[in-house]
Amino acid sequence: YESPGMQKYMKDLRPTVFADLIAMNALYRPGPIEYIPSFVRRKNGEEPIAYDLDAMEEYLSETYGITVYQEQVMLLSQKLAGFSKGDADALRKAMGKKQKAVLDKMKPKFVEQASEKGHDPKILEKIWTDWEAFASYAFNKSHSTCYAWIAYQTAYLKAHYPAEYMA
């Protein structure tokens, strides 16, 4: 939270809840960082919160319609395409380890099964592309929460007890 880039984004964001800190921690990484301007605008009411599919709102409302965490990919793959918990975890692992061959096998399954549930294949292709763009650097929420909590505590100490903090 101390880099100039993160400080700029945090000022723009004007966080009001701890969940904002958690999300920013997860987003400030290669790949997901491109979603920060939209995340900030949506949080501040400067851009409408939109979902590629209405069915995604359940899992993306807390992050203003943007997929931020690995868990969201897992839950959405289950909801949209009927992936089993095992398939969803395999998807998470493949994205996290950048296993392109595994992802290339899973994509048609995702698109086909989600299409069978009535979702537009073109929108599904966009969703998958978005997931691929962010997922190789995505945090799980618990990881992001721990780092955000440490940053929050550090900022508090720095602001209220600067001499003790620096000692």
Question: What does each of the following model-derived ranges do?
Answer:
Residues 1-167:
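Noncatalytic, beta-rich nucleic-acid-contacting surfaces in large DNA/RNA-processing enzymes
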